[in-house]
Amino acid sequence: MLFNGTTKYRDYAIVISLFFLLNVYLLYNTAQHTQVGNSKHISSDSGEKTSNPLPSCEITDDLAKSAISRAITPSCKAKLQLEACQLKNGTFTINFPENQCPNHDSRLIDQRIGCFLDKKEARVLTEFEYKLPKSNGKATCRKHCYKAGFLYFGLEFGHECFCGNDVSNATAVDDVECRAYKCPGNENSEEFCGGFNAVEIFRTGFRSKVNHRKPTYLPPSSDSIKNPVKILFLLQLNGRNERQVKRFLKSIYLPHHYYYIHVDARQNYMFSEMQKVADFLDNIHITERRFSTIWGGASLLQMFLQVIRDSMKIEKFKDWDYIINFSESDFPILPISDFERLITVNNGKSFLASHGYNTGKFIQKQGFEYVFSECDNRMFRIGKREFPQNLRIDGGSDWVGIHRNLAEFSISDEELPRKLRKTYESILLPLESFYHTLAFNSEFCDDLLMSNLRLTNWYRKQGCRCASLKPIVDWCGCSPLVFREETMKKFELQKAISKPTYFARKFDSMVDIDSIEAAEMQSISPEKLQLNHPTYHFAFANIFKTGIDEQKLHFESLANFALKSTETRAKFRKVLRIDALRAHHNALIEIVMKIETTDGATFEFLIHRLSHVNLTENEEKLVEHGYLLRAVSFGTKFEWKEELCREYMGFVTDNDTLHTRLQWHPTEHVKKVGDKTSPEMIFKYRKGDELIEQTVVKPYDSVFGGQFDSWNVGKKLSNLTTCSNFFVDIISPSSPDDAPPLATLHFPVYTDQNAHCHVDYLRQFFKIADFCTSGDACKEKIWSTSYPDPKSDIFVGYDEDTQTLI
């Protein structure tokens, strides 16, 4: 009986185990075919046919265990488990074919140069160094130096691997000096890894160092362009500022090119607005096959490749010569006709930006040594990567201009692109290096011009703020800043010509519309611009639209409050839309809200936010360690690199993190400590007179003079059913205990439970400045979303007479 019972339980255990594994596989498979909303959401394989074995290992790698523990959905956990097992079992790495670039010569691989004197202060190979205490050897060192494009590799001191391109000044020593240390990669072999101050040098397999060619500026000509190329302009859109996108589209539109629009799968408002634009023009296509293109995600490359595939199947679009991608924050800084001429003259070449520095360092900074996996709208780091022996890596920017021949090769089923696509599913920021790497390992290596013809507004000390990336990627990276008055000089005409650069980024009309105007006047004929139009300096960005976004109680409270200010008897039905308005780059942001009443009437309101900040009247007391406190503000959805809150309305709910920003200005008496631009301060958070929390805010380094504290409202506050007043006191650490604060900020917290308090809050923090009650009346209000805005309006299509979109 005992034997039979044990057998039965064993059978049950087997069945349960098989059922569990089947469920894991099905969950993973489901994750690969998830649809988001009404859009076709593409999985990371994007059509690649792969066979995924079931996970069958114990995860021991700390990175993988951490990633799996942080994943939210079962399907994501299953995906990470599967890939971590493949990595552990050695089935993750792919063997690549031999490099087909003419600069590669297999006869040069491991060709010995000799043994040379080498010292720390006078290295022979100076470009890059790897420390490989467990794996160093000829094959390993050669692999690392080859992937970075170096001509030579050298072994020394057992665990040291050096890379470089020049051995002309090397001093030869006796070969026995390079046989002092066995290679740690295989202690039982007779392979040696150099000596003490002696490096043994070999060839990696490249014939010569590559000198990148760059395009040169072509001056405007009255002669028409012969056989102009057909460009597929790919607009990769995010956000809700559709007016800026339409303004950009108007600046680059020519009827003989194609415009292919991809909108992030999470941005349904932008998608709906772009659909309206596509209805007017046959050469504009908006794809319904949408990806969530998170920062650094594999999905960005998958989207780009899918656009190539899909565009070749559309009859009206399939004969393009180039695909060139842009974002919602790009703008031309030279005429589009000049750009078209340069591309045509260089037809056949692809335009790729180089990283501009040592390739070994680039590989290191980009995280190529690690395996990443995208799911749950995040890039998880799951382990170290084992690179194949013969893959040359390069990269730079993910803003590219790809010729048709290279584009077709990239989606083909040939061995190199097929295997590279698979490998790049697990590489961070894949579009920044995929086409570089594909070209440098193929016959296309000589068909490159190393410039993407763009100017990027880098300020890395400010743009490399990792805090904003923590929720979406297990890595730290950089993003460019928005052009402002002080950085517009970067794209002045002569500078743009000298590079040449035909486009620049980033532009944001809600931050500084003047920079867009400067670029526009440099790239577009003045007669096509309506510089004197009342809304020329206006910037709008949508916040809410009915049918797309979820109605929120505090929005409805504001709508009711606004409606009651008109003394109408009409009853509120729903909010139709809310937009942020900035009348010029120095103006405060205003709110434009459009609502519908129960009788079908519409009202549109201009609403001003009221600040509740009390600064001490004695300016001398606002100076702390030589820094003058100029302003205090608060908000949510904080953007670290631009130092502003993207929630323009000023609402704080129990689901938000409150960000309080101090604006400092250095005086002549400032005592700077390092690079810091602000002093240490104390923030006291109060509910009425009750102290909730006190935090010490350390000095901060900001190009804009900002200093911040983040406070999670939901975690810090509870039982928000009463009409409480909340405050932040800004206090100097050197002040006596009874001294008044330098400043006090007053803010409300809106919850569904304290809806009866909303009117009280709204009365304190908002003012109804103006309103209109019909479509015709609102068209006369300059602040209304119905008022004409010719710089971005597209209501008809292409006008042959003016040669513009109208």
Curated annotation (Swiss-Prot):
It is a single-pass type II membrane protein. PROSITE patterns: WSC. The keyword Transcription does not apply. Its cofactor is a divalent metal cation. UDP-alpha-D-xylose binds at residues 264, 293-295, 398-399, 479, 505-506. SMART domains: WSC. Keywords: Developmental protein, Disulfide bond, Endoplasmic reticulum, Glycoprotein, Glycosyltransferase, Golgi apparatus, Membrane, Metal-binding, Signal-anchor, Transferase, Transmembrane, Transmembrane helix. Residues 109-205 form the WSC domain. InterPro entries: Glyco_trans_14, WSC_carb-bd, XYLT. Disulfide bonds join 57-85, 101-445, 464-478, 466-476, 772-778. Signal peptide: none annotated. Glycans are attached at residues 89, 169, 325, 614, 655, 719. GO terms for cellular component: endoplasmic reticulum membrane; Golgi membrane. It holds the Pfam family WSC. Belongs to the glycosyltransferase 14 family. XylT subfamily. Catalyzes the first step in biosynthesis of glycosaminoglycan. Transfers D-xylose from UDP-D-xylose to specific serine residues of the core protein. Required for vulval morphogenesis and zygotic cytokinesis, suggesting that glycosaminoglycans play a central role in vulval morphogenesis. This is Xylosyltransferase sqv-6. It comes from Caenorhabditis elegans. The gene is sqv-6.
